[in-house]
């Protein structure tokens, strides 16, 4: 369950940032998780509850934003959002594309007091 490792590191980063600001409490964390990152949002929330105890984030609210998959078609020179996991360009049917978004695992923001 790599969500525990991800959240352990995220809480450590959040705590260090809060301490640098002389904060006494982390009120909220917002994370961006890509749809094809391999991270399960529900498991990440569960991991947060497990690892935040005893830290400045103990009572914080975790908000998870899902980032959809966006591709760029090298043939059409256009971005597109694939309707499923078969990343065929809807305009030209090309399979020559690059993934622009959807793999993110990021701590977007931190709210402290």
Swiss-Prot record:
Chain coiled-coil ranges: none
InterPro entries attached to this UniProt entry: Hydgase_Ni_incorp_HypA/HybF_CS, HypA/HybF
Top-rank lineage group of the source organism: Bacteria
Binding site for Zn(2+): 73, 76, 89, 92
Family annotation (Pfam families): HypA
Binding site for Ni(2+): 2
GO-annotated molecular function: nickel cation binding; zinc ion binding
Alphabetized UniProt keyword annotations: Metal-binding, Nickel, Zinc
Example GO biological process: protein modification process
Functional note: Involved in the maturation of [NiFe] hydrogenases. Required for nickel insertion into the metal center of the hydrogenase.
Stored HAMAP family: HypA_HybF (MF_00213)
Protein family according to the UniProt entry: Belongs to the HypA/HybF family.
Protein name: Hydrogenase maturation factor HypA
Species name: Picosynechococcus sp. (strain ATCC 27264 / PCC 7002 / PR-6) (Agmenellum quadruplicatum)
Lineage per the UniProt record: Bacteria, Bacillati, Cyanobacteriota, Cyanophyceae, Oscillatoriophycideae
Gene name tied to this protein: hypA
């Amino acid at each position: 369950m790599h969500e525990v490792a991800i959240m352990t590191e995220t809480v450590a980063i959040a705590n260090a940032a809060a301490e640098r600001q002389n904060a006494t409490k982390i009120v909220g964390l917002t994370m961006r998780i890509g749809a094809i990152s391999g991270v399960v949002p529900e498991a990440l929330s569960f991991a947060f509850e497990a690892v935040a105890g005893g830290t400045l984030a103990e009572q914080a609210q975790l908000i998870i934003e899902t980032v959809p998959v966006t591709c760029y078609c090298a043939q059409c020179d256009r971005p597109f959002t694939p309707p499923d996991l078969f990343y065929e360009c809807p305009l030209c049917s090309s399979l020559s594309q690059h993934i622009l978004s959807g793999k993110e695992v990021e701590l977007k923001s931190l709210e402290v007091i």
